[in-house]
Amino acid sequence: MKKWILIFAAIALQLSLSARTIYVTRHGQVGYPMKEIRETRLTELGVSQAQSLANYLVKDLKFKGNIYVSPFYRTIETASFTGKLLDQKLILEPGIQEVATYPVPTPPGMSFAKIESYFPGLTVPGKRFVDQWRLCNESHLERNKRVAKVLDIILAEDKGDILFVGHGASVVSLVQALNRKIVLREVRKIKGIAWNCALYIFELNDQDQVTGGKYTTSYMADRDITNNFRCPLIERPDDSRYMTRAQDKADRAKKAKAAQGKTSGKKTEKNETANTRKNEEK
């Protein structure tokens, strides 16, 4: 009995020492995922998601901290609704940008002048923002290291509440990095899928250790929860813009089979070349 009392007392002490809150979210819905290597705007639903998120953050959670945003149009547009409610500027942070994990053409990122033309008076360049901020292809491990490093730098520089607005991949890396700051076994990791505008909430003490938090999409209806053009929580046979779960599964299986075919084709070609050389030597 005493053991449980001590455990609960320790948890209560950690929670009471919560000094600030860190919020992490992904941009609102955009179109087909391959467009993510270019500058895409939010769809009508994406705008609605961003507005719902902003209202929840500012009106329900009373968020008043700084907003760090990946310098893509879709992330800035998502964060702009929260920024406007707070009447504050967004901080452009290339450290939480999205980078492809496979070889693709990497277009240059928008310059600050270009961003300012789209969002006049709403953004400021962060300390790490330069006009050549766009990164090239990187592995998952490289992304995790990059994002974790930037997170630690920002937490050291900014001691208030913070909202990060990133992408599916960079949000996952941010959440992993923050979960590693849990020191008590009694504090559970914050888990949840990075849907468009889903929200991860981390409570930190004055040593930047995570003492609690949660994941939520409560401010959006299930029908409005998306992974860009996919709508994973419910079937959408009535709307051709979205894949149903069955279509999604079939699409993934088709792509996996095609990728496997390319790999086996390369192996066959390699073996044929080797056999040809052997015959020539004979």
Where are these regions (language model features)?
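Flexible, surface-exposed loop/gating regions in the mature catalytic domains
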Residues: 118-141, 168-169, 173-175
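Hydrophobic h-region of N-terminal signal peptides that target proteins for export
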Residues: 9-17
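Active-site-proximal alpha-helix that buttresses catalytic centers in soluble enzyme cores
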Residues: 20-93, 136-144, 149, 252-254
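Acidic, low-complexity terminal tails and accessory targeting/binding regions
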Residues: 98-112, 176-282
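Beta-strand elements within well-structured catalytic alpha/beta cores of enzymes
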Residues: 21-26, 68, 158-170, 174
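Glycine-rich phosphate-binding loop signature in dinucleotide/nucleotide-binding domains
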Residues: 60-63, 154-160
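Phosphate-coordination/substrate-recognition cap region in phosphate-metabolizing enzymes
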Residues: 55-128, 188, 192, 200
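Positively charged n-region of N-terminal signal peptides that target proteins for export
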Residues: 1-4
